[in-house]
Amino acid sequence: MEEIQRYLQLDRSQQPSFLYPLIFQEYIYALAHGHNLNRAILLENPGYDNKSSFLIVKRLITRMYQQNHFLTSANDSSQNPFIGRNKNLYSKMISEGFSFIVEIPFSMRLISSEERKGIFQSHNLRSIHSIFPFLEDNFSHFNLMLDIQIPHPVHLEILVQTLRYWVKDAPSLHLLRFFLREYCNCNKIISTKKPGFLFLTKKNQRLFFLLYNFYVCEYESIFVFLHTQSSHLRPTSFGVFRERIYFYGKIEHFAEVFAKDFPTNLCLFKYPFMHYVRYQGKSILLSRGTALLMNKWKSYLVNFWQCNFDLWVHSRRAYIKQVYNYSLDFMGYLSIVRQTPLTVRSQMLKNAFLIKNPINKLDTLVPIIPLIGSFAKAKFCNLLGHPISKPVRTDLSDSDIMDRFGRICRNLSHYYSGSSKKKSLYRIKYILRLSCAKTLARKHKSTVRAFLKRLGSEFLEEFFMSEEEVFSLTFPRVYSLFLGVYRSRIWYLDITCINDLANQQ
């Protein structure tokens, strides 16, 4: 961010409304490539950096505004350089540069908001790290789940209209509108099988994610409002406390006035759902109550989105299910809500009573069957989970073989350290350990038993460290104090970056 300010010299107190002139600045594209936005394009086109000039960008924008330029047939695509290979190259340049420019005002706004102390920021609710407290929170009062599939926008113009509330620059929005429309039209001329929206998703990922996140955040505004009004985790400053008193006062007044006419609809406003999380195109809501209450929430949200955001949510894509009968795939984890019996001892005078209460608890388990299938595909074991050797690695040295197996084992241990039950994780580590031993024994033309007896059974413990040892290396000062706390479940916030398991469907 300091690098951007050094080039742009923008004042934080002013909202940068005029972003259109920045598109013609050559250093914008140099900054975009300097942040490793899309290195695949550089590999496919070696001379890509040399073509990022003011003249090419200006010519491209001029061509986009010439409507007759796009009225070509499929046979002329080989003769027209813009419809051919250069069209993809220039469009990627504009999309990367535009996405980098549009992020500038949002970065400025985020920095200015962080400087204000004592104000609750709802942006934290939309972070991917909000999934971890969702997985560990108490589910004792929730019995119903509403699973909503987030639909794609029916038209690309909706993405531009969503961005219009954030960027007050008409020329930039017009350029984005022309770019999306004409670029998708050119794609339909070349290949009519791929829709323009899907093609934009695959070929211009950074621009798509930027527009799609704004699109999702707009319709999520109702969730943020309900969470900020009903959450008990907000800071207790004077302004927030007064706002909370006014909110509950309005609810009580509403209940007194309309209790006679609408006695069954009060719970819809008095007890909103308390859990919300979004992951991989799904919105998941947890609430307490009956199925009738969730159906009311479902109808209310669908009508609210259709009337205010032009978001068409089909009723068949919104599922209402019982919490304790539903499993959920989250970031490579298999999450299952189970009822755990809790025994409470109560004593009155000389009589003692044992009260058993079932409590819903979310167990994050390691998906052992998909992992064994992946290991079998990678030739670490067979389909039954029995470890086998890897003949491909017998040409390597012993240290390289152990380092490669140990890196995979430590990565999985690091990733699945937040699982509530470690039995499946230990089985995965056993498969890797025995596969490594069989590979080394095959290299030295010996049996596994003789190889382990000759070197000892502890020769692999150095690189197969457990999650507690990883935590002790990461936080050496506090590990001794919180040894018992972090022995069961440890969440590492960087697992979404170091492992592709978080992005699997």
Curated annotation (Swiss-Prot):
Localization per Swiss-Prot or TrEMBL: Plastid, Chloroplast
InterPro entries in the record: Domain_X, Maturase_MatK, Maturase_MatK_N
Principal cellular location given in the protein's record: plastid
Protein keywords: Chloroplast, mRNA processing, Plastid, RNA-binding, tRNA processing
GO cellular component: chloroplast
Pfam families linked: Intron_maturas2 (PF01348), MatK_N (PF01824)
Signal peptide limits: none
Keyword Transferase carried by entry: no
Keyword Iron-sulfur in annotation: no
One BP annotation, GO: RNA splicing
GO molecular function: RNA binding
Similarity comment: family membership: Belongs to the intron maturase 2 family. MatK subfamily.
General function of this protein: Usually encoded in the trnK tRNA gene intron. Probably assists in splicing its own and other chloroplast group II introns.
Record-given protein name: Maturase K
The organism of origin for this protein: Apocynum androsaemifolium (Spreading dogbane)
